[in-house]
Amino acid sequence: MQPFRTLHSTVTPLDRVNVDTDQIIPKQFLKRIERTGYGEFLFFDWRQDPAFELNQPRYKGSQILVANKNFGCGSSREHAAWALGDFGFRCVISSSFADIFHSNAGKNGILLVKLSEGDVNTLLERAQKTQGYSLTVSLEEQTVKDGQGFSDSFEIDAFRRYCLLEGLDDIGLTMRYQDKLDAFEKEHDGKFWLAPRGGLAASRTS
């Protein structure tokens, strides 16, 4: 997972409330478990409209999505985070997020920034009116700035912040303790009453 420290990017505005996960990635595309290949189906139904934001050349290559409140509601599908990341978004800014989506996004390297409704509306308006409108999001400083006078700070769980800064998903975090895991297995491998038949090492590779 790519570490997230400071991101400077143009902004894609999505001025819609209650954007649910079925709109983010419709159910007919949830037929595999790989994390890649979903970007082309992001907001699939809405992208049938030529006027939809993601179809506009001015927003091409944007890595920051600014959306209205209650983003990511609906089902718990992790594919929603996969689709956003595969499309190229590394940060989503909104005034509120659904809890499960919030967890899924962070575990997949996407920084979710919660700002006030007033500040989100300001960013939406500026992104809609200003060609090439950009933001700088610093996870290290926990700030959002646009170089035009807008500046705000945001809160984030300390553990999630650490994982994003280090580029660690759940597996990567676990693998940092590989030496301790190996030592535990070695220590307990001879205690047959605690291990499956063949020992801990055998059970892990079976």
Swiss-Prot record:
GO terms for cellular component: 3-isopropylmalate dehydratase complex. Its EC number is 4.2.1.33. Pathway: Amino-acid biosynthesis; L-leucine biosynthesis; L-leucine from 3-methyl-2-oxobutanoate: step 2/4. Keywords: Amino-acid biosynthesis, Branched-chain amino acid biosynthesis, Leucine biosynthesis, Lyase. Transmembrane segments: none annotated. GO terms for molecular function: 3-isopropylmalate dehydratase activity. It catalyses: (2R,3S)-3-isopropylmalate = (2S)-2-isopropylmalate. Disulfide bonds: none annotated. It holds the Pfam family Aconitase_C. It is an enzyme of class 4 (lyase). GO terms for biological process: L-leucine biosynthetic process. InterPro entries: 3-IsopropMal_deHydase_ssu, Aconitase/3IPM_dehydase_swvl, AconitaseA/IPMdHydase_ssu_swvl, IPMI_Swivel, LeuD. The keyword Membrane does not apply. PANTHER family: 3-ISOPROPYLMALATE DEHYDRATASE SMALL SUBUNIT (PTHR43345:SF5), 3-ISOPROPYLMALATE DEHYDRATASE SMALL SUBUNIT 2-RELATED-RELATED (PTHR43345). Catalyzes the isomerization between 2-isopropylmalate and 3-isopropylmalate, via the formation of 2-isopropylmaleate. Heterodimer of LeuC and LeuD. Belongs to the LeuD family. LeuD type 1 subfamily. This is 3-isopropylmalate dehydratase small subunit. It comes from Acidobacterium capsulatum (strain ATCC 51196 / DSM 11244 / BCRC 80197 / JCM 7670 / NBRC 15755 / NCIMB 13165 / 161). The lineage of its organism: Bacteria, Pseudomonadati, Acidobacteriota, Terriglobia, Terriglobales.
